[in-house]
């Protein structure tokens, strides 16, 4: 064999393993993920679950094709998702489209949510396909009256990540036995949707400068869906509970707003997470402020989508209030955020403890916000560098746990 022929043969032989492994990777990459998510569009946090999970998949499993199986992507949400994720396929909610998706996808990933929102979908997937599934970043309160169905669904999954440790312990206590059950934060931490140009223009229009305002969001004990979603009947019991507790729950926010304006140079933005809160902000905070305080408070009168809101939060000094997802969106971008919780919100607020932000968690059921909220808000305003450092630590914990979730998913896809 002459030298040239030897070299050619040797090089070709050496290339074979890499070619083979490349073909194997390509073959594995053909596996498709069906993401069950996008629960509703009247809350920017419920919207944010999906782009957060899509960003994680894009970052950690870029070679896999993803199709979204939504409940709702109306009100401009589909367009917003496609703008950020142009390769995304959104399944039509028809029997034919579902049948095709079931046949052509290999793994069902249930996205983040206030529970196993797509529990019936998981059962249908399992019964019709026998293919694997996993659950990523949910709160779980024990299944309620589902006669053990939730435990079976958790146990049948290849993995189940819970977005707060209380939910994780509940699943264990109820006897759930998925091979991997761990703390895995809400995928909203990974949401990177922004709409900078319109957001910056609006802030200029209302006189808010970057880093010189803090955001505030109120919330009732029960979201009044009868006001913001078609077909939802008025709930007299929930409405009565809202009326009973709204001054108790929102007065600490109002007091913090007044303190910020009177004791610092900061302005305050009263903004919504869901479509009912513009009215709530006006009724319970803005209209009850002293006239001199109102001059440095901006009340946003319109609902907004996740990308616009994120761009505003990113330009703020921080956020506080009775909501959960806007604080998650903030921490995900290194912006300080305080959560005030109560039992009607389920256990999701405890994820603040799980990511090391206990000092920024206040429980209305124990009147913690009444005493501690204003000092905590003022501390963020008066020492922004320390506050941002604390936010960064919380973000790092969330990022690490979300990576773990993606690593587990990859292992299942490549098994």
Segments the model singles out, each with a brief description of its role:
Residues 18-19:
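Hydrophobic membrane-targeting alpha-helices
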Residues 11-14, 23-415:
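Active-site anion-handling motifs in enzyme catalytic cores
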């Amino acid at each position: 064999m002459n030298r040239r022929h030897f070299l050619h043969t040797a090089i070709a032989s050496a290339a074979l393993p890499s070619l083979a492994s490349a073909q194997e990777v390509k073959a594995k990459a053909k596996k498709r993920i069906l993401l069950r998510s996008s629960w509703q569009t009247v809350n920017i946090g419920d919207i944010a679950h999906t782009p957060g999970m899509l960003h994680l998949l894009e970052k950690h499993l870029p070679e896999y094709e993803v199709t979204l199986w939504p409940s709702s992507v109306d009100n401009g949400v589909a367009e917003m998702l496609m703008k950020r994720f142009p390769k995304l396929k959104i399944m039509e909610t028809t029997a034919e489209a579902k049948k095709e998706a079931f046949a052509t996808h290999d793994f069902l990933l249930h996205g983040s949510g206030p529970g196993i929102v797509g529990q019936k979908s998981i059962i249908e997937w399992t019964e019709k396909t026998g293919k694997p599934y996993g659950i990523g970043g949910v709160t779980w309160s024990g299944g309620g009256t589902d006669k053990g169905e939730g435990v079976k669904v958790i146990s049948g999954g290849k993995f189940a990540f819970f977005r707060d440790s209380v939910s994780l312990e509940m699943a264990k206590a109820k006897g759930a036995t998925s091979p991997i059950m761990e703390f895995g934060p809400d995928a909203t931490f990974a949401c990177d949707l922004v709409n900078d140009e319109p957001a910056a223009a609006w802030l200029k229009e209302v006189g808010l400068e970057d880093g010189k305002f803090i955001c505030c969001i109120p919330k009732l004990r029960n979201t009044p869906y009868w006001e913001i979603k078609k077909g939802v009947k008025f709930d007299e019991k929930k409405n009565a509970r809202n009326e009973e507790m709204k001054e108790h729950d929102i007065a600490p926010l109002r007091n913090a707003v007044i303190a910020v304006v009177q004791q610092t140079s900061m302005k305050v933005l009263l903004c919504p997470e869901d479509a009912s809160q513009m009215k709530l902000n006006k009724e319970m905070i803005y209209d009850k402020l002293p006239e001199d305080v109102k001059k440095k408070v901006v009340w946003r009168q319109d609902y907004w989508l996740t990308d616009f809101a994120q761009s505003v939060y990113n330009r703020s000094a921080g956020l506080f209030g009775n909501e959960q997802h806007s604080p998650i969106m903030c921490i995900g971008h290194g912006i300080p955020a305080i959560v005030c919780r109560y039992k009607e919100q389920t256990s999701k607020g405890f994820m603040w403890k799980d990511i090391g932000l206990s000092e920024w968690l206040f429980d209305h059921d124990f009147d913690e916000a009444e005493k501690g909220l204003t000092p905590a808000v003022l501390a963020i305003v008066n020492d922004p560098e320390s506050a941002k450092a604390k936010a960064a630590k919380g973000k790092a914990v969330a990022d690490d746990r979300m990576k773990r979730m993606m690593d587990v998913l990859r292992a299942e896809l490549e098994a």
